[in-house]
Amino acid sequence: MAAKELSHLQQLEAESIQIIREVAAEFDNPVMMYSIGKDSSVMLHLARKAFYPGKIPFPLLHVDTDWKFKEMIAFRDAQAKEFGFELLVHKNPDGIEMGVGPFTHGSAKHTDIMKTQGLKQALNKYGFDAAFGGARRDEEKSRAKERVYSFRDKHHTWDPKNQRPELWRTYNGAVNKGESIRVFPLSNWTELDIWQYIYQESIELVPLYFAQKRPVVERDGMMIMVDDDRLPLEEGETVKDELVRFRTLGCYPLTGAMYSEADTLEKIIEEMLLTRSSERQGRLIDSDQSASMELKKRQGYF
């Protein structure tokens, strides 16, 4: 009797689970980054599957910039309570003390201090030697050339010209003291794969991904949701309730919504089949300068 062939999603799932298990076995102190978005939700689901019926044997880390959507924070805390995983939350205390924010310091400086430097602080504080991330190669060109095991030096910086070969899904995890790796189990997934897997597995998501009426202002060609009273209105701006959803999530002043009527998973998948634009076009931090994502990654960003 012929062995049952795995579907495309089953193959991706098996590959990701194998990577998660291998890192958990090989490294002394791994951690899973948890940004609360759809990719993080899929990665969390895969980690739960990888070690079922036991608990996930490593903590989840959220680097909180203090500017995330309120719904994201509520969802994060609800997921930790429901599934019982260890959740670590880190805010850059220096950035908080300086009052760093996207309006006072600009998107580039805010991202560097609150996300990149905050992440490096947390990794140093807890001594993690491997950190899982939900990045995919189809997202952005600098991520397209990054390995599944992405090596970082003692300063957490990345050298794209000095990456190790990964042949036949064989990964070299040897690191020197003080070095670490970033691990991307979803490297070979596409955005459509993610949505189809979410539908197949009935994975719960932040409601921001689904279309509904939300208060937004149009600014610099993007629709920014008014999530709290810290968003200052510029001259001539008015807040309007529009039927929108978010394709990607980050700090709310730096994340653009899109017009959409997709309020179910089926409608979102149908929308994805027709779209011809990048999901990260709604992320202001990616347009700070040419090759901005690669520069951020070289400096220690995920």
UniProtKB/Swiss-Prot annotation:
Tagged with keyword Acyltransferase: no
Pathway: Sulfur metabolism; hydrogen sulfide biosynthesis; sulfite from sulfate: step 1/3
Gene Ontology biological process terms, A to Z: hydrogen sulfide biosynthetic process; sulfate assimilation
Record's catalysed reaction(s): sulfate + ATP + H(+) = adenosine 5'-phosphosulfate + diphosphate
Entry annotated with the keyword ATP-binding: yes
InterPro entries (UniProt xref): PAPS_reduct_dom, Rossmann-like_a/b/a_fold, SO4_adenylTrfase_ssu, Sulfate_adenylyltrnsfr_sub2
The EC number(s) this enzyme carries: 2.7.7.4
Enzyme class (EC, first level): transferase
Name of a matching Pfam family: PAPS_reduct
GO molecular function, a single term: sulfate adenylyltransferase (ATP) activity
Keywords: ATP-binding, Nucleotide-binding, Nucleotidyltransferase, Transferase
Function of the molecule: With CysN forms the ATP sulfurylase (ATPS) that catalyzes the adenylation of sulfate producing adenosine 5'-phosphosulfate (APS) and diphosphate, the first enzymatic step in sulfur assimilation pathway. APS synthesis involves the formation of a high-energy phosphoric-sulfuric acid anhydride bond driven by GTP hydrolysis by CysN coupled to ATP hydrolysis by CysD.
Classification via HAMAP family: Sulf_adenylyltr_sub2
Family, similarity comment: Belongs to the PAPS reductase family. CysD subfamily.
Quaternary structure and interacting proteins, as annotated: Heterodimer composed of CysD, the smaller subunit, and CysN.
Identification of the protein by name: Sulfate adenylyltransferase subunit 2
Gene for this chain: cysD
